[in-house]
Amino acid sequence: SGAKVADGRIVATASGIAVAPHLVEIDPTTGVVTPLATPAAQPPQAGALTEVTATAEDGTALRAWLRLPDGTGPHPLVVFAHGGPWGSWNAWTYRWNPNPFVAAGYAVLMPDPAISTGYGQHMIDRGQHELGGAPFMDIMALTDAAVARVDIDAKRTAFSGGSYGGYMSNWVAGHTGDRFRCIVTHASLWDTESMGHTTDNSGWDGPMHVQNATYNPKDAVADIQVPMLVIHGDKDYRVPIAQGHALWYDLNTYSATPRDDHGRTQHRFLYFPDEGHWVLGRGNAEVWYRTFIDFLDEHVQGVSRQAPSTLG
């Protein structure tokens, strides 16, 4: 991800889906990569890592990574949709890290659909102008391939994502009925028509404007049937908090999600007054992971958890 050249030696930082950033030396003649000594060991990895493949409707080869808990399963599954939208799961992150979910007993599917990087310009172009089109269909194809495995429980699944992945979560919520038991959406685009006029990235308005009539998640709110956990930071200027507020209001006013036995909404809102587009504070990150996993436990596994003590 970064490199320095001195005395014929190339020193760089390298990382991957299961490897945190670390220093390496690259031989410019042979290309051999040698890890260098570091003061801290690599973070331990939970479970096992494998790949899932599928074929898109247009014949494009698709890939996802699948992190599996220990044991034979079948395991409950949570799907992670990446942000960007130009991105890939083939990178280390302390946000949206699968380890806590795997440790909690969940298999984690991380698909790279149309618009993902690392697969050539054609892959990006497939999804560039239809954010709820080919990327959605690719993710569903990879999810189908994952739940066909004997170690995955097809009846206990959830969907999630942040930023563009949150857009995808909202889109999935309105277009898959009760396929997933619950959906978690973080810093998400809900109303693309208003989003382009309020974000700090004004470049969004043009590309989104021509897609609003076809790919605006808000238009399918009446078809949302499952509980959603909405997460947003008040200091988010990339996807302003108004998107989260609008989503929360629309879910509780117009969605088809049934209320609980006491007539209360099953949707939840996790609000961070001091966070932006990313949740970076250590205590806040712990609350993020705990609340996320507790929501999965409640709706995927039928187990209620006590809210984290640090949750205000």
What does each model-found stretch correspond to?
Residues 1-13, 42-51, 97-99, 220:
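Conserved beta-propeller blade repeats
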Residues 5-8, 25, 29:
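Helix-coil-helix junctions within alpha-helical repeat/solenoid scaffolds
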